[in-house]
Amino acid sequence: MRRFSRADRDSVRQWLGGWRGLGATAGCAALATWACFSPAPAADPATASQPLWTSAVVTRDTPTRSVPFDVDLGGATSVWLVVDDGGDGFGCDWADWVDPVFKGSGVEKALVDLDWKRASAEWGEVRKGKNAEGGELKVDGKAVARGIGTHANSVIEVAVPAGATRLVGRVGLDDGGANQGLGSVRFAIHTKAPVIRPKRAQAGGPVAPADGPAMLVVPEELEATLFAAEPLLSSPSDIDVDASGRVWVCEVTNYRGRKDTRPDGDRILVLEDTDGDGVADASKVFYQGRDVDSALGICVIGDGPGRKVIVSCAPDVFVFHDDDGDLVADRKESLFTKTGDPQHDHSVHAFSVGPDGRWYFNFGNTGHAVHDSQGKPIVDRMGNVVNDGGQPYRQGMVFRCNPDGTDFEVLGHNFRNNYEVAVDSYGTLWQSDNDDDGNQGVRINFVMEGGNYGYVDEHTGQGWQVPRTNLEAEVPKRHWHLNDPGVVPNLLQTGAGSPTGICVYEGSLLPERFRGSLIHCDAGPNVVRAYHVKADGAGYAAAAENVADGAADRWFRPSDVCVAPDGSLLVADWYDPGVGGHGMGDVEKGRIYRIAPQGSAWSVPKHDFSTVTGAIAALASPNLSTRATALERLAKEPEAAATALAAALGRPADSRHAARLAWALGGLPGKAAATVKRLLDAPDANHRIVALRLARMADIDPLGAMEKLAVDPDAAVRREVAVALRGVAGVRADAVWAKLAEAHVAGDRWDTEALGIAAQGPGNTSLWDGRLAAWLAITGDGWKTPAGREVVWRSRGGLSPKLICDLLADPQVGTSESLALIRSLDFQDKAAASVAIRDLVTNIDAPDEKLQVILPELVMRIDPAGGTEGKLAERIAAAAAAVPGTQSFVDIVQRFRLQSRAADLVDLAAADGTTDAVAVSAIA
């Protein structure tokens, strides 16, 4: 199989007429690489040649999700196998040609054994023996042994073998699309080259800009209105809203297959409503150039001369300066370089300014590493080089740094495509993450500093599909290794989707239930949601509510959302017929909607940033850019600001506003200590959390603050103490950890993982030995309680393998918990674990039903080089006997060279019902 060369592309375009986005690679996450998720109007198979055969539209509801074909070729020398989207858009349209065979007198040749002349797919690749993404071919849950996977719209040209007169087989909807809840395809076989022409959009989009708001379903108290649309802008990938209500837009035209559409480069636009009617009527180009092609993030700080605009455009992060305040860039600086693959949506995303004045951002799993403006690798505060090589970080990450790029921190890692990070007024971080397409695993995360979020195996880097002990029953949870110790739980899983922009709503214009909620865009299912968050043990729980549902306009592709100065929401709409495979179906359209209470007129509160008083007042704004501008202004007059902020801090009734004032005051020179002391005894648990975070930022006796808060009655405060212990060694720190472990409540996974984070040492070292010793000294037999067993399960110290094996021998520990403990052994020192397991297997006394489950798992973790005599040999034989006919049986026999069972391997390989994989390994 081959991919198209450049020389092929003109022919492909001739075949597919006006169809766009050819040659896409698999893997999607957001924007135009969104998860092949949502149906949208696309191409109609109106062709220059009539097909010999056309199927009915195949959907999830079609019996067996497939139909047969048997076509007389009529002497043709070539055939074209065509898949179109069935007329409802190309979202989720994964298609399979199942065991197609050319037949004739004395001729029978499988198509998969032939080389095709050309092959194209609108998303992913045309592949033999694999689906369009490279996964297993499956139709209606059944594996396809010999077939071709593709994705609508697709054309495959094949020469007919000599003597062949018929083509026979089946066609079907691949599970990769069907399992996302959508997908509809139509198949056709031609004997002349087809020309697929674009058709006029059907119901579901596009609609005229003026009709767009009526297509969105919003809560009954709210309304959607149009703030801006084409021709004022097109294809907004990301937005920010400044203190004057201007909307700053990354306008993307030069994206992937269309990367040369605009020779002068993509643009950073500034949209403004000059007459106050709630509709933008002016557009200005702040910057245009090839260096911002396919920019994915924008953040605006300042509201006049000296304005800074951070633009994320992999592999670079630029800071543009508007020195004179005329809304045109005067100069450009590089902040970070070599940060992600260019033209890829899994690379570097938008920046956000926290209430502490520091800058936050993230990248997905094509971000790879961060380098400074000179191209030198960044080393973070923990002493680790910031890259995804597994030492210790993997895949997507979340970051924090000073505005000059110094004091760099990795706050979380092992995400797939965490699209943006939102920081609330307490300094708590939130984001979404996209699954591998088709696995119903999109998630919302509370980012616990230092956390591993489980996209791949933390130690091996293997994907979630690789078999492992204590495997999660549901694929959406298995996708994130949620049963593994060391993986922070998800706040919420939202099913299939294509998550994009996110913010925290801290205004008062929307109804009360939205205050403090996350507002999130999911472009695949055409929806903007609110996630109403509440405390849950040491972490959080959330419930979802739709804020804007585009079910009536399938072109609605929300790419970002911001809170405007008046507290309304502004939603950027990429507006495109489909999502998937780095494709882009439209380059001319784009919208921005305003969502607000019914009848609420657009307004822009005025702030006087020229005075300290005015800047402090601006900290009450629901708009993030306004608050960032205020923080920057206050830092210029620290003495006057300190006096005024100290007075203001005692006045606000709103908890979040008070937190912002505290951050602003504590961030001034010499003011952190008093602010921390003031907040440590605050009645609001969130303010006590701010106290500790501020103490750490300013390095004002953070360990003293931890000692005080280690016995706090609030579990979230204690969690924050654990997180703060990360990288802090010594007897005092170990004693704090021991108190936290002793207070652990069984079943609180957030707290369990915080305790694990607390044992991470600097430079990828471990603090577990000191932590465990301090705890065991005070807990007595507490490590055997349900809560204590969770701490042991999470631990990774020198004592951990022995403690885990002792628990496995405990009759109070059931089979299910035993499997979790066995999985924990995979994260221990291998030599120490093997010794402990060898002793356990030799001496364990447990019911047969428990032994039959755990022995096969345990013996595979023993090093055969240490000898396998006596009782241990008996247990190994028993382990093999417990799993006959399975891969585990094969593995045990081969690992320990059980000669007495060698013949059983041969029998197993030849037995009916043995899977191909097991049969092959049995005789390997």
Residue locations for each model-derived region?
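Bacterial Sec-dependent signal peptides at the C-terminal "C-region" and cleavage site
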Residues: 33-47
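Gly-Asp-aromatic-enriched flexible segments
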Residues: 43-204
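Generic recognition of flexible, low-complexity loop/linker segments
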Residues: 69, 156-158, 213-214, 236-237, ...
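Long, ordered, helix-rich scaffold segments
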Residues: 572, 588, 595-924
